[in-house]
Design a protein with these regions (language model features):
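A donor-sugar binding/catalytic signature common to diverse glycosyltransferases
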Residues: 101-102, 150, 275-321
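Conserved nucleotide-sugar phosphate-binding/catalytic loop shared by glycosyltransferases and other
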Residues: 32-76
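A nucleotide-sugar donor-handling region in carbohydrate enzymes
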Residues: 8-9, 42-44, 147-222
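Active-site and donor-binding regions of nucleotide-sugar-utilizing enzymes
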Residues: 4, 8-11, 16-26, 66-168
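C-terminal amphipathic helix plus adjacent low-complexity
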Residues: 342-390
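Short internal beta-strands
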Residues: 34-39, 150, 240-244
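Donor-nucleotide binding loops and adjacent catalytic segments primarily
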Residues: 53, 188-285
Length: 390
């Protein structure tokens, strides 16, 4: 019997992580892939990236528009309401056997809620992680409680999902889905990459991705301005910016990026989305990654790229030795960037390993989705952890 697997994607970064899984589902004779596409994929402001999905040969079976042209807290709540309406209707039409959701964004939270109410089993990827500075932290744990199957990326995260009351026999640590796939992608040559992004990569080029700290009020502009001032103080840097997601106050950061690039056209460039190939290729040729994105923590260790993680947004994640965390201040950011650009630091991470890399992640997830015996209902018991284990 063929199982119908619906996979949700609400944005460019998420799709890049999911693509290896989609490829594996497609080649499985006992699985049928359905894609539910929403969020930033359908927004012109964020590049209409659903077209990238279609260019890769996939069919967007359902498209649910939900993003409003505002990034206030109230607007995001309204977007979530629109998503709930659209997702429930889409799931009713698709009628999947399993609904796959990755991560922790508000779009994913709404999708999981709709699936729970519609009594559709959810398979959640990357649960158990911590990001104390982002509202995604609460969303992630809530999605965990609404899910039947859990695919975590480290043993530490597996323990945390158990601590949330999920049975160990429904939790699988296969590593990060994108890490294994990234190693298999042949990057563009440096000259071809420079041609495609219309930007020359110098010996001191950094990639900057900075998102709002969504559990704080009104800090986005000040925090990002501190980063820009630190870059100015260091001097002689070439900077590639990738813009933020559709988070509260994200447009403040994007506007500052546009203004900075306009004032510094010779040594800066900005993209709404680099796309997976250009992003991976960029990691091969830059000197450092700077910002507060999970990609800087999970993906850069594979390429041994020196990385600065700023502030508390990603606080709580497992860190590889190529990542150093600094406080949110001009002085601290400048010091951290100067440190990771040093030859001494680069030499110190030559033999490092990526804690999120376990190999064949997508294949193992698909095998589990294909073979796991689904219960008749979505009922599940709370798994109590022995007091001796706490």
């Amino acid at each position: 019997m063929v199982r119908k697997i619906c996979v949700f994607t609400g944005g460019r970064a998420e799709y890049g992580l999911l693509k290896p899984l989609l490829d594996e589902i497609v080649i499985s004779h006992s699985l049928e892939l359905k894609l539910l596409v929403s969020g930033m994929h359908l927004s012109s402001e964020f590049g209409l990236t659903y077209k990238n999905i279609e260019d890769d040969g996939f069919v967007c079976d359902e498209k649910v528009e939900m993003i409003l042209s505002s990034d206030t807290a109230v607007s995001i709540c309204k977007s979530m309401g629109l998503g709930m309406i659209g997702f429930s209707e889409a799931l009713e039409r698709i009628k999947p056997d399993i609904f796959v959701i990755l991560g922790d964004r508000f779009e994913s939270m709404v999708a999981a809620t709709a699936a729970l109410v519609c009594r559709i089993p959810v398979a959640h990827i990357q649960g158990g992680e911590l990001t104390f500075g982002a509202i995604d932290d609460q969303f992630r744990h809530a999605i965990t409680k609404m899910s039947l199957l859990h695919f975590v990326t480290t043993d530490e995260y597996k323990k945390r999902v158990i601590q949330l009351g999920e049975a160990p026999d429904r939790i699988f640590n296969f590593g990060a889905i994108n890490v294994d796939a990234m190693k298999k992608i042949q990057p563009l040559s440096k000259s071809e990459l420079e041609k495609q992004i219309n930007f020359s990569l110098g010996p001191r080029t950094i990639l900057v991705t900075f998102h709002p700290v969504t559990l704080e009020n009104g800090t986005s502009g000040n925090y990002f301005s501190q980063l820009l001032k630190a870059i100015d103080e260091i001097g002689c840097l070439k900077v590639i910016f990738t813009k933020t997601n559709a988070d509260t106050d994200g447009r403040i950061i994007n506007d500052l990026i546009d203004l900075y690039v306009e004032r510094n056209p010779k040594n800066t460039v900005a993209f709404t989305s680099l796309g997976q190939m250009k992003y991976i290729s960029t990691l091969h040729y830059i000197s450092a990654v700077v910002g507060n994105s999970s990609s800087g923590i999970i993906e850069t260790p594979t390429f041994k790229v020196p990385t600065v993680n700023i502030g508390d947004r990603e606080k709580g994640r497992v860190l590889a030795s190529n990542v150093i965390t600094c406080k949110q201040s001009i002085k601290a950011i400048r010091s951290a960037i100067e440190k990771v650009l040093s030859g001494e630091f680069k030499d110190s991470i030559k033999d490092m390993i990526n804690p999120y890399d376990r190999g064949e992640t997508a294949k193992n997830i698909v095998k589990t989705i294909r073979e796991y015996e689904l219960p008749i209902t979505t009922k599940k018991e709370f798994y109590d952890v022995s007091s001796t284990l706490l």
